[in-house]
Amino acid sequence: QQSRIHCTRLAGQKADNWWLRQSPQVMGLQFVDGLGRADRDNAIDVYMGDEYEDVLRDGEWQKRFKVKPEVFTAEEKKAWLAGNQNVTLGSDAFFPFFDNIERAHKSGVKYIAQPGGSVRDSDVIACCDKYDMVMAFTGIRLFHH
């Protein structure tokens, strides 16, 4: 079973990837005619990732794109991700430590709904206050063991 921070990290990475897909660099990609949806999605994932050269090297980009895309630099990604704000995060269980809030903040989270009930709720609240986040305790855990 994944820990709560692993779940928060994964959710943050998914939100970041979704937001990167909305960037002008990705939205402006010109795919070759007839390229299937799965191939487009895979090309986008590789293009946004650290191994972007796999789809940009000569002999490869021509299979996917009409025009060779410019590299989507780490600086450009960071700048674009900074614009992702007012994200909402919901959790089916309480956050046991403030590190979950720290990670959520990196992905633009501003609003959190969670059951509450951790012995460290005060630490979690303090971290939310530090980033001017709004957190609501629902009082309801949404899973069974």
Question: What function would you assign to each model-found segment?
Answer:
Residues Q2-H145:
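Feature captures the catalytic cores and cofactor-binding loops of soluble hydro-lyases/lyases
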